[in-house]
Amino acid sequence: MARVERLPRPGETLTDAEFFTAPGGKGANQAVGAARLGARVRFVGAVGRDSFADEALSGLRESGCDLDVAEVDAPTGVAVIYVDGSGENTIVVAPGANGLVEPVEPEGAVLCQLEIPLPAVETAGSKASFFCLNAAPAKPVPVDLVRRADLVVVNRYELEALPETPRLTALTLGDEGAVLLEEGEEVARAEPPRVDAVDGTAAGDAFTACLVVSLLEGRPREEALTRACKAGALAASRPGAQPSLPTAEDVDAL
């Protein structure tokens, strides 16, 4: 990750960046986020046999996640992130080993993203007691996958890429908060608390993890959405991806 005062223009070189590496990835961030909120988490994924593998898994281990991770003959997935002074970012992902994640059929609730192969997502959601699809990054997905999901989490751009309207959608709106849509009709809305945004890299992952955990705890939809917005705001107010993810105590105190 490189922190810069402003994002570079095409062809421009900036020389005042602060650079560091940290574990991340949508799936890993959401797993760590859910674990910090008190959920028992099993993380399924893949890493390469390289120097990035241990760091990629370090946050998951520290958060107490159970790991079901294969070592494969491909580089560990990485993302190159630029974050400007206002917390806005641009991200380029080299999926590497993530593209070789094998399908599994986990029991219980399942949260998947689209940074792994679609067959793995489809299989994981096929027998889940609760299936949440975070349809990110935006890409074409089979209509059956959307129909199977109990909850689909998207931003405006990802919503446009869906083949049809999900049964239940959490639509994130950045600093405007989020809405829950049932069959396309708004049923709940929440605004985030005002914070000084530092880095929005994991804000969406914090939101998604908190929303899923809150719903699985049996909280009413509006309360779950409000807590999720708080989690996202807290993550945006801290630097880094996994280091920014809040605990349940953090969320409840805001």
Kindly label every feature range from the protein language model.
Residues 1-44, 53-55, 197, 241:
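Glycine-rich phosphate/adenosyl-contacting loop at the front of the ribokinase-like
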Residues 28-32, 126, 147, 222, ...:
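A broad detector of short, well-ordered amphipathic alpha-helices
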Residues 32-40, 83, 214-218:
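Alpha-helix C-terminal capping segments
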Residues 42, 57-71, 79-186:
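Ribokinase/PfkB-type carbohydrate-kinase core domain
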Residues 18, 94, 191-192:
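Short clusters of small/polar residues that mark proteolytic maturation junctions
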Residues 164-254:
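Conserved phosphate-binding/catalytic region of the ribokinase-like
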